């Protein structure tokens, strides 16, 4: 059986990475999974969330934000800000991105820093969450390498790499 886009059932979408897509970010990539396109960026900033200070938690923090731009789908998708709240799907996906990256980053090596990951979907043609996780991992390691070069980190806090794919049978 062949899919609409011509792939066989056991064939992944083509995966592409265009690095340094956002020059002011510490790490950034435009990731493509087939026709899906997501800009993933990583920024390190001083300070940690208040809850970490109040609970005397050592190390840093990593958090993610995920958004589908209005023109990313065939039918315009309203921005979360215009509705006054994050939609449930976006909230679930950004938590998944954060958890996936926290699983492979040694937060203690960040020191008192917060690592912000932003994933902005330019085109949604399936696999936005998997593209976001994979692209975010690339952007995070790029940010770490920049901080190592600038002597702001001794070594990369990335202990493993994270990548994601999804598969379905129908």
Predicted regions and their residues:
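Short, Gly/Pro- and small/polar-rich lid/capping loops
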Residues: 1-25
């Amino acid at each position: 059986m062949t899919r609409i886009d011509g792939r066989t059932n056991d064939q992944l979408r083509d995966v592409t990475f265009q690095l340094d897509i956002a020059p002011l970010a510490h790490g950034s990539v435009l990731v493509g999974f087939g026709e899906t396109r997501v800009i993933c960026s990583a920024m390190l900033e001083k300070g940690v969330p208040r809850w970490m200070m109040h609970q005397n938690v050592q190390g840093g923090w990593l958090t993610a934000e995920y958004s589908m731009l209005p023109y990313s789908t065939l039918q315009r998708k309203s921005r979360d800000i215009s509705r006054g709240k994050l939609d449930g799907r976006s909230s679930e996906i950004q938590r998944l991105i954060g958890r996936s990256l926290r699983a492979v980053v040694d937060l203690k090596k960040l020191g008192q820093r917060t690592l912000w990951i932003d994933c902005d979907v330019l085109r949604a043609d399936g696999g936005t969450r998997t593209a976001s996780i994979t692209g975010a991992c690339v952007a995070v390691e790029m940010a770490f390498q920049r901080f190592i070069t600038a002597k702001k980190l001794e070594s990369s806090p990335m202990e493993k790499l994270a990548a994601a794919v999804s598969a379905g049978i129908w």
